[in-house]
């Protein structure tokens, strides 16, 4: 199970995604933990079984157990937070004075370098489409001294994984419908 299997699963019309997936795994802008944590958290955020299985297997070979669990934790807590904060954002500030009341302890104590965890939360928030969370995590990353190039590379990784997941679902759906 691997990125190579995902590339092979992509249909011809998704050739750009295949090339981008190959390129992102060779990035020099992200260190290994940043890259594979971003890929794993993004794969979890897509809710695509095949993408998560393939990325998860390769990430398990690369990441420490702590980083592996933290990346999945980022995807989980952001699934909750992205819905909450995106939903509250639709309400024109009428609920901004109320306490969220949601447990999110992993954000304060992720078990890995805080900036890496924030990077994974940023990537997942982009996939889940929460502008407030994307902006908040980007601000935290910049305050921590993370470069714009590193942040953009994580965004690219999230975009590629999201596109791969969609292309695979589209291909599988059309194959079973025809």
From Swiss-Prot:
Disulfide bonds join 130-133. It is an enzyme of class 1 (oxidoreductase). Keywords: Antioxidant, Disulfide bond, Oxidoreductase, Peroxidase, Redox-active center. It catalyses: N(6)-[(R)-dihydrolipoyl]-L-lysyl-[lipoyl-carrier protein] + a hydroperoxide = N(6)-[(R)-lipoyl]-L-lysyl-[lipoyl-carrier protein] + an alcohol + H2O. Antioxidant protein with alkyl hydroperoxidase activity. Required for the reduction of the AhpC active site cysteine residues and for the regeneration of the AhpC enzyme activity. Belongs to the AhpD family. Homotrimer. This is Alkyl hydroperoxide reductase AhpD. It comes from Mycobacterium avium (strain 104). The gene is ahpD.
């Amino acid at each position: 199970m691997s990125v190579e299997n995902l590339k092979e699963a992509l249909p011809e019309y998704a050739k750009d995604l295949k090339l981008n997936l190959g390129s992102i795994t060779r990035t020099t802008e992200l260190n290994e933990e940043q890259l594979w944590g971003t890929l794993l958290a993004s794969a979890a955020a897509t809710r695509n079984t095949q993408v998560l299985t393939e990325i998860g297997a390769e990430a398990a070979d690369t990441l420490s157990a702590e980083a592996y669990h933290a990346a999945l934790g980022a995807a989980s807590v952001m699934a909750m937070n992205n819905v909450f904060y995106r939903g509250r954002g639709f309400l024109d500030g009428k609920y901004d004075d109320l306490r969220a009341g949601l447990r999110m302890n992993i954000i304060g104590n992720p078990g890995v370098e805080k900036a890496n965890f924030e990077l994974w939360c940023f990537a997942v928030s982009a996939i889940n489409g929460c502008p407030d969370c994307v902006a908040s995590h980007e601000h935290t990353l910049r305050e921590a001294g993370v470069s714009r190039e590193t942040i953009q590379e994580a965004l690219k990784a999230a975009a590629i994984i999201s596109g791969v997941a969609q292309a695979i679902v589209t291909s599988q759906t059309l194959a079973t419908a025809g």
